[in-house]
Regions:
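Sec/Tat signal peptide C-region and signal peptidase I cleavage site
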Residues: 36-40
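Terminal connector regions
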Residues: 145-151, 328-340
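Histidine-centered copper-binding motifs that mark active-site loops
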Residues: 41-314, 321
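A conserved active-site cap/scaffold subdomain adjacent to cofactor or substrate pockets
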Residues: 275, 319-331
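N-terminal secretory signal peptides that target proteins for export/translocation
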Residues: 1-22
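Bacterial N-terminal signal peptides
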Residues: 27-35
Length: 340
């Protein structure tokens, strides 16, 4: 009996000693983990003030929505490992929200009213907070009503860490320009929505894709036009809407001579982070200075490939690298709608 007791005590002491060592090891590892997380998770905060504004893009003053006084919305930039803290201040007379297109994040931060959150009502402030766990070019926009169509869209860029194993020298360290493509119509977005719902051919007539009733009568095609409309065979086009203006970073034309104060010279390479924030237009992209090198698509790195032109669909993003060929000359980067 004493023998058994001695053995039992010896085992207990040994197990207790192992337990203390394991506990100490776990506490040490936990402390290291917490310290690393604290270093890695830098909080990057943006305050976004959403407010009505008046613009004149196409000859008439029209209502639009500006964020921090600008269209498109400010470009939001982060580095993988950061924590994004985006505070939206709603100064509109209607509710609003923000959706992060293509981002991996907690569902409650996704920005869809009545699904992942309640609408942000007039006068309210709402904070989106989520970890940045990916890299690449993406964009963000309102997910309330038709606010995106009148200005609530912007670039969302997530950079790689310098020690990232996928970091590509000569690509990921180049000077960058975010480019947001969009369209503008002087029609209220609610009217555009109604005309599309009613299958109106007014936009097709404006673009010359179909004949008006007067033209159909004059050319002897009135019967055919009526027959097609009776069959609901409306004139088709690549884009359903006629737009008064195409915008690049909120302007029809931009003259760029430097990036972050540094003048561009022959041989310099520039990375263009391009997002199509348009409502319905595909854009053909061309560069007068030579070929473009595609290096990423929808936020994902791709094997670099040279192209003469590139088409970008609604909501897509592309990263392309262009080279400045000569000094003292302007080289046009042009976006043309496919239904031109």
């Amino acid at each position: 009996m004493p023998f058994n007791i001695c053995i039992t005590n010896a085992i207990f002491k040994m197990n207790n000693k192992k337990f203390l060592h394991k506990k100490l090891l776990l506490l040490t590892l936990l402390a290291l983990f917490i310290s690393q997380v604290g270093i890695a998770q830098k909080v990057v905060r943006y305050d976004l003030y959403v407010k009505d504004t008046i613009v004149n893009y196409a000859g008439k003053e029209k209502r639009a929505i500006a964020v921090n006084g600008q269209i498109p919305m400010p470009t939001l930039e982060f580095t993988e490992g950061d924590t994004a803290e985006i505070v939206l201040h709603n100064q509109l007379k209607e509710s609003t929200s923000l959706h992060w297109h293509g981002l991996f994040l907690p569902n409650k931060e996704d920005g869809v009213p009545f699904l992942t959150q309640m609408p942000i009502e007039p006068g309210e402030t709402f904070t989106y907070r989520f970890p940045i766990i990916q890299t690449g070019t993406h964009w963000y926009h309102s997910h309330s009503g038709l606010q995106e169509q009148i200005g609530m869209y912007g670039s969302f860029i997530m950079h790689k860490k310098a020690d990232d194993k996928t970091f590509r020298k000569g690509i990921d360290d180049l000077p960058e320009i975010p480019i947001m493509l969009s369209e503008w119509t002087n029609l209220r977005p609610e009217n555009v929505h109604r005309m599309l719902h009613n299958a109106s051919d007014w936009f097709a007539i404006q673009k010359g894709a179909t004949q008006s009733y007067a033209e159909a009568i004059r050319t002897g095609n009135f019967k055919t036009k009526l027959k097609n409309e009776w069959k609901r065979m409306m004139a088709m086009d690549v884009s359903d809407v006629y737009y008064d203006k195409v915008l690049m970073n909120g302007n029809h034309l931009t003259d760029l001579k430097s990036i972050d104060g540094k003048s561009l010279k022959a041989g310099d390479k520039v990375r263009l982070r391009i997002s199509n924030g348009g409502a319905s237009s595909y854009f053909w992209l061309r560069y007068a200075g030579g070929k473009m090198t595609v290096v990423a698509s929808d936020g994902n790195d791709v094997e670099p490939v040279d192209v003469d032109r590139l088409i970008i669909a609604v909501s897509e993003t592309y990263d392309v690298v262009v080279t400045i060929p000569e000094n003292g000359k302007a080289y046009e980067f042009m976006a043309t709608t496919e239904d031109r």
